[in-house]
Design a protein with these regions (language model features):
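Ordered alpha/beta subdomains of enzyme catalytic regions
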Residues: 1-235, 244-245, 354-397
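Glycine-rich phosphate/ribose-binding loops and adjacent secondary-structure elements
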Residues: 3, 208-397
Length: 397
C-alpha cells in the first residue's frame, strides 16, 4: 500500500449495519446477496494507481477481526444481543467475496457476492476506502484539509452564535474525505457545540463516548423482495414485523421510501404506529413528506409531538434549520447529516453508492420517492415492481 491503512477497526462503520445484520443472523441466514458499486458523478476517472491502492486496502481490510474491547462495546449497546456479539467474535471480512475491475476508460467496478449476513458488512468499509483513495491521490490532500477546517470553523461559529438551533447526528462515514478528517469533525462538533447528539460511526461513538445512532437502510426492506413467499408490494409489512420482533419497540425508527412512502403507509398501521417511535425521510419533498406523516399519525390517534421525524436526505445546516423551524412545534425533529459534515471541501464530493441488487439470485430494487434514486440492474424487474406497487396502491386507496 502507498497509503496508510484506511480502515483500522471493524467498528468503523454505520451502526445500522449491525442492527440489520443481527436480524439477518437471527432470521434469514439462508439469504445470499450481490452488491454493486456505482459512482453517480459524471466523468469521474479512477486511475490504475488508484485501483491498485483500493485493492491493497481491501486486502488489508480482510485481515481485521473484532478486538475484545470492541466486542465488549457492542455488547454494551442495549439492543445488541450476546449471541450476535459472539458470532462477530468469529466473523471477518472474506476477500473472495469482493471482485474489482477497472475499465480502460477508468470506470471502477466493485461487486460483493456472498451470504447476506457477511456481504452486507462490506458496503461502508469499501465506500470509505474508495473515497479516501480517490481524494488523496486525485488532489492535494493538505489543501483539501485546510478548506475543510475553514468551513468547519464557520459551522461551529454559526451554532454558537445561535444561527442554528436544531440537534443532529453525524452520518458521514460513507462519503468522508478521510478517516482522520471524520474523526476531527465529529470530535469538534461534539465538543464545541451543544447540537451534535451522536454519530452513526460506531468507532467514533466508542472513542468519544457519543451515542451511536442508526436503525435500518433500504437494503433491509429490499432483501424481502428476494424471499419467494413474500408478495413484492408487502415487503414493508414483513420488514417491520421482523424488526419489531427483534427489537420489541427499541431502536424503532422506520425508513419509509424503499418502495415509496405511499405504499409504506399502507403497512404502517395502528400497531406499527405505536410500535415505532418515528420515521426517517431519505427522498422526495421533505415538507410534503412531513405533512403526510403527521396526518397519518393523527389518523390513528397518535400525537405527532411524541413521534420523531428524522430527516437525512442530502442536508446542509441551512436546509436542516428551515425544516426544524417548520416542524418543531408539531413533532420531534432531528437530522442525520453526512457529507456536509465529513467531506465539505473546496472540491465536489463523490456521490458513490454500493447497493443490494440480487437476493438468492432474484433481482431486488429501491424505488424511493425520487425517481432518479432508483437503482436496479434488471429493468424488466424494476417495471414489474413498479406495477406491483401501483396495483396495491390503486386497490387500497
Amino acid at each position: 500500500m502507498k497509503l496508510d491503512p484506511i480502515v483500522v477497526s471493524l467498528l468503523d462503520t454505520d451502526l445500522y449495519k449491525f442492527n440489520m445484520d443481527q436480524v439477518i443472523f437471527h432470521k434469514h441466514t439462508d439469504l445470499c446477496g450481490e452488491y454493486y458499486f456505482r459512482c453517480r458523478n459524471e466523468g469521474t476517472v479512477f486511475t490504475k494507481e488508484m485501483f491498485e491502492e483500493i485493492n491493497a486496502q481491501i486486502d488489508h481490510l480482510c485481515t481485521l477481526t473484532f478486538r475484545k474491547d470492541e466486542l465488549e462495546y457492542l455488547d454494551s449497546i442495549r439492543f445488541i444481543k450476546r449471541d450476535y456479539v459472539e458470532f462477530l467474535r468469529l466473523w471477518r471480512p472474506i476477500r473472495d467475496y469482493v471482485e474489482t475491475s477497472l475499465s480502460p476508460e477508468g470506470e471502477l467496478s466493485i461487486v460483493v457476492k456472498g451470504p447476506l449476513f457477511s456481504a452486507m458488512q462490506f458496503e461502508i468499509y469499501l465506500l470509505e476506502i474508495v473515497n479516501e483513495v480517490y481524494f488523496r491521490m486525485r488532489y492535494d490532500y493538505d489543501t483539501l484539509l485546510v478548506s475543510a477546517r475553514e468551513r468547519l470553523d464557520r459551522k461551529i461559529q454559526d451554532f454558537n452564535s445561535g444561527k442554528y438551533t436544531f440537534s443532529f447526528a453525524e452520518f458521514g462515514c460513507r462519503r468522508r474525505l478521510s478517516r482522520e478528517w471524520e474523526d476531527e469533525a465529529v470530535r469538534r462538533l461534539a465538543t464545541e457545540t451543544k447540537n451534535c447528539t451522536g454519530t452513526s460511526n460506531v468507532y467514533l461513538a466508542k472513542k468519544y463516548g457519543l451515542t451511536p445512532i442508526g436503525t435500518y437502510a433500504h437494503e433491509f426492506v429490499q432483501m424481502y423482495q428476494g424471499i419467494d413467499s413474500i408478495p413484492l408490494a408487502y415487503t414493508n409489512h414483513y420488514a417491520m414485523a421482523d424488526w419489531y420482533d427483534e427489537y420489541k419497540g427499541d431502536n424503532g425508527t422506520a425508513l419509509t421510501d424503499t418502495i415509496t412512502t405511499d405504499l409504506f403507509l399502507l403497512d404502517f398501521n395502528r400497531a406499527m404506529v405505536n410500535n415505532f417511535n418515528g420515521v426517517r425521510h431519505d427522498s422526495g419533498d421533505p415538507y410534503a413528506w412531513g405533512e403526510k406523516i403527521i396526518a397519518h399519525y393523527q389518523k390513528y390517534g397518535a400525537d405527532p409531538k411524541t413521534k420523531l421525524l428524522l430527516f437525512s436526505d442530502s442536508l446542509d445546516f441551512d436546509r436542516a434549520q428551515a425544516l426544524y423551524d417548520y416542524f418543531k412545534d408539531r413533532a420531534k425533529v432531528s437530522f442525520g447529516i453526512g457529507t456536509f459534515c465529513s467531506n465539505d471541501t473546496s472540491e465536489e464530493p463523490l456521490n458513490i453508492v454500493i447497493k443490494l441488487q440480487t437476493v438468492n439470485g432474484r433481482a431486488v430494487a429501491k424505488l424511493s420517492d425520487t425517481p432518479g434514486k432508483a437503482m436496479c440492474r434488471d429493468m424488466d424487474y424494476l417495471e414489474y415492481l413498479k406495477r406491483s406497487v401501483a396495483f396495491r396502491l390503486n386497490r387500497e386507496k
